[in-house]
Amino acid sequence: MGKIVGIDLGTTNSCVAVMEGEKPRVIENAEGDRTTPSIIAYTNDNETLVGQPAKRQAVTNPKNTLFAIKRLIGRRFEDEEVKRDIDIMPFAITKADNGDAWVEVKGEKLAPPQISAEVLKKMKKAAEDYLGEPVTEAVITVPAYFNDAQRQATKDAGRIAGLDVKRIINEPTAAALAYGLDKGTGNKTIAVYDLGGGTFDLSIIEIDEVGGEKTFEVLATNGDTHLGGEDFDNRIINYLVDEFKKEQGIDLRNDPLAMQRLKEAAEKAKIELSSAQQTDVNLPYITADATGPKHLNIKLTRAKLESLVEDLVAKSLEPVRIALKDAGKSPSEIDDVILVGGQTRMPLVQQEVEKFFGKAPRKDVNPDEAVAIGAAVQGGVLAGDVKDVLLLDVTPLSLGIETMGGVMTTLIEKNTTIPTKKSQVFSTAEDNQSAVTIHVLQGERKQASANKSLGQFNLEGINPVPRGMPQIEVTFDIDADGIIHVSAKDKGTGKEQQITIKSSSGLSDEEIQQMVRDAEANAESDRKFEELVQARNQADHLIHSTRKQLDEAGDKVPAADRGTIESALSDLEKAAKGEDKAVIEAKIKALAEVAQKLAQTAQPHGDPQQAQSNSKPNDDVVDAEFEEVKDNK
């Protein structure tokens, strides 16, 4: 059985880790980095770039470079949060046929799970390169406050990437696993404050140790799935745009290229202001008008940044209060505060968290890697490699059904430990009613319409008797991934109807299978592209070395031989610009053969074997170049 890897599929960055014996290890990607930007770009050459290569070309290709896709996963186009993003994202967010929020790139509509799968594929490839074996199973993390549709969509992304998702685990819980694995013994209650690129979670977790076995029990969780570093960046961007408009009278919001440059500059300024008191945002040639080019140069102080985002930090503390109340704990009863997510590096965030809890947060947990490490630990538990660890997570939102008068009747309360199962008996609202519709809801409001609709199904064939007589037993079953299964049974007739919740949105199995097939087809075309690039690199190397030898040999080369070599060089240069690998390889062979004479002419006193080898494509050099090209895919 292969390894089960742990993947933190983040809004801004993603990370993959695996257990090596009893120790988790973060795996570097092809570029040698421990985290990978969750950015996907579609180039004019029909190439898909993921991670740093995609980020590098974002400024010149803003409409086809997709980032923060996690904010759209499992969401409806009509959601308020999506409407806010439509105004600020340089790429097109569009409405899918099923009402979901999708993205349009080059006239093609793409589902968020399909896009996220590209990031997961890169994580999978990094793990395979490191382990030297295929990776087919993973534990993937999600924000604790993700609803059922968002969890389903994340699992779909895993399937499209060719991964069997063994478990969906909540990010703060994963961070607690990473923290608790090597932070000594004893019982502790910890708060995990997880402010990432696009989401915020707060979980109160109890770590108990009995007889060497550690139990991680989530007491309560709360959060905001649309609050994160991207929102902090947007505050800076809006400030810079407004300042520039005041100075120059030009609104940069209508210029996607300028907005992409501003996004990069805002992120850079935010990071710099975590250690410096002031930074210059300097973007020459940001735009132009009839009077000529315009340059943006604005000073930004830490104090100004803090004034721009202080309400966002304050907003994050409200879920903290609710989670503490739900857990029955006061801030003073929390033993340790763990900060997770890159945005927690901001001094203001650290100060406010310290002020709230009355204690300094721990600094010995890497905020970028803890979640992936925890996912790897859970992978080790599922594989049987990690013993004596028990994880008890909770469902973040209450679950119930709509009953008479448009009321939500709750069957499973929020913060119930999962997996769990709960049944309740309902009856009909009308005389002689032969069917009932079970409308499944998730949320905390009493008014059914104010909660998230997860879907509905019918139970038919009920005996036509006076209202209130039939006994319909509705059962909710939540699995360890937090995914919901619902059944309804008429106790009178024994008829039963059951479904795994597929929200009215989401991808159908057929759509997922099609996306899996597309991904496999792309993998084949990617392989052919890489082979073509390898052949071109061999050609470039041979052309360069042959020209160099031809120049050095000068008049020593007979005119007839020079003509033959020049002709072979020209043929290879022409072939290398084409798309046919076989033709390029044939021309490489032809040039290598005629270049042997040149090598002998250029080095008449040298080792003939050495001279001959110099004229051939140098496999080592080519492989290095080939790897570099592959990395950028």
Curated annotation (Swiss-Prot):
Sorted UniProt keywords: ATP-binding, Chaperone, Nucleotide-binding, Phosphoprotein, Stress response
Residues carrying Phosphothreonine: 199
Output the superkingdom of the source species: Bacteria
Disordered: where is this region? 598-633
Leader sequence range is none
> Matching PROSITE patterns, A to Z?
HSP70_1 (PS00297), HSP70_2 (PS00329), HSP70_3 (PS01036)
Pfam families given in the database record:
HSP70
Q: Which InterPro entries match?
A: ATPase_NBD, Chaperone_DnaK, Heat_shock_70_CS, HSP70_C_sf, HSP70_peptide-bd_sf, Hsp_70_fam
- Entry's SUPFAM superfamilies? Actin-like ATPase domain (SSF53067), Heat shock protein 70kD (HSP70), C-terminal subdomain (SSF100934), Heat shock protein 70kD (HSP70), peptide-binding domain (SSF100920)
Q: Name one GO molecular function term.
A: unfolded protein binding
- Where composition is biased (Polar residues), the residues are 598-616
Q: Nucleotide-binding as a keyword?
A: yes
Q: What triggers or suppresses the expression of this protein? A: By stress conditions e.g. heat shock.
Report the Gene3D superfamilies cross-referenced here.
Answer: 1.20.1270.10, 3.30.420.40, Actin, Chain A, domain 4, Substrate Binding Domain Of DNAk, Chain A, domain 1
- Write down the PANTHER family for this protein, in alphabetical order: HEAT SHOCK PROTEIN 70KDA
What is the documented function of this protein?
A: Acts as a chaperone.
Please state which protein family the record places this protein in. Answer: Belongs to the heat shock protein 70 family.
Its protein name is Chaperone protein DnaK
- Origin species, per record, is Aggregatibacter actinomycetemcomitans (Actinobacillus actinomycetemcomitans)
Q: What is the lineage of its organism?
A: Bacteria, Pseudomonadati, Pseudomonadota, Gammaproteobacteria, Pasteurellales
